[in-house]
Each structure stands twice: as C-alpha cells, then as structure tokens.
Regions:
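Short amphipathic alpha-helical segments
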Residues: 34-36, 56-57, 91-94, 111-113
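C-terminal amphipathic helix plus adjacent low-complexity
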Residues: 135-165
Length: 165
C-alpha cells in the first residue's frame, strides 16, 4: 500500500529534471553533509540533509511543504533511504532501484533490509558510509543484485483492502 502516484506529474518531473536520484534520510541520519561522487543528473533531497555533488549534478532540496514527494521518488532512477515501510512501499510499487541505509541497532530496519535483499529487490549501504557516496559503485551494486523481474510481483493493494472492508 502506498499513496497514489500521478503519472502525469511523474512524467513532468522526469521531463523537467531528467535522470535523478532521490535521497531521504530524515533527521535520524547522523550526518550534516553527504557528498555524492560520479553522478550527472538531478539529486532530489528532503529536509535535514545537505548534499554536496562533486560531478555535474544539480541538487534540488524539496521544501518541507512538498505534498507529493512520492511522485519525485517515482520519477527517480534510484532511491537512497532509511528502511521505513512507507518509503519501501513507494519504491517497490514504482519499480525503482532501492538502496537502503543500514542503521546499527535498528532491528526492524535490519530485518526489512535482509528480507528485501533476499528477494532481490533492494541493496544496502552502511550508515557510516553515507558521508561519501560513489554513484558508480552504487550502480554496480544495483546491477549485480537487483532482479528487475522480481519487482513485478508487487502491486498496490489499496483497492483490494477497501473492497474487503
């Protein structure tokens, strides 16, 4: 289950910004800055994170009042995020590359990450490696571990649940 995507809005975001990465860590990330290396495109980020891009990338800080962050997520090629179920659902249902942040001692995140990796629908990086992210290495990790066909198993069950109620 996730918020309803707006295909027209997603297409408009893709047209305006081109290839993109969506990074959201919330306020629980211990870093003030994240450096992104080897990426040409747009980097969408949410409040609480300062992104420094070393290549020919454009950083777009989404205002806290952005009501449709899920459409930006769905318009992006890759999502780097904490392992909360809202973001996981949106990433899986939009069939995006999902890179989850391993946070030591957060058992629910660890269990989510391990299960999604086992299913071949996500990869992970350690929170301690967030200070500097090499997108070339991330893309290689994705290519080696995410099985695109496995993403087809997921659909938004909101309608099914409403019918049951």
């Amino acid at each position: 289950i996730c918020r309803r995507f707006d295909p027209d809005r997603i297409a408009a975001i893709k047209e305006q910004y081109g290839h993109s990465v969506f990074i959201t860590c919330g306020k629980s990330a211990y870093l003030n800055n994240i450096q992104i290396d080897n990426y040409d495109g747009t980097i969408f980020t949410t409040s609480g994170i300062n992104i420094i891009a070393t290549a020919n990338a454009t950083v777009v800080q989404l205002p806290v009042e952005t009501f449709d962050t899920h459409n930006y997520l769905a318009a992006s090629d890759t999502i780097i995020a904490k392992a909360g179920w809202g973001t996981i659902s949106e990433a899986l249902l939009s069939k995006r590359n999902l890179v989850l942040i391993e946070r030591e001692g957060v058992l629910e995140d660890t269990e989510n990450i391990e299960e999604l990796k086992r299913r071949g629908v996500a990869v992970s990086i350690k929170e301690s490696n967030l200070a500097r992210i090499d997108m070339q290495a991330i893309n290689e990790l994705i290519a080696e571990n995410i099985v695109r066909e496995h993403l087809d198993a997921y659909h938004n069950a909101m309608g099914d649940i409403i019918r049951e109620l």
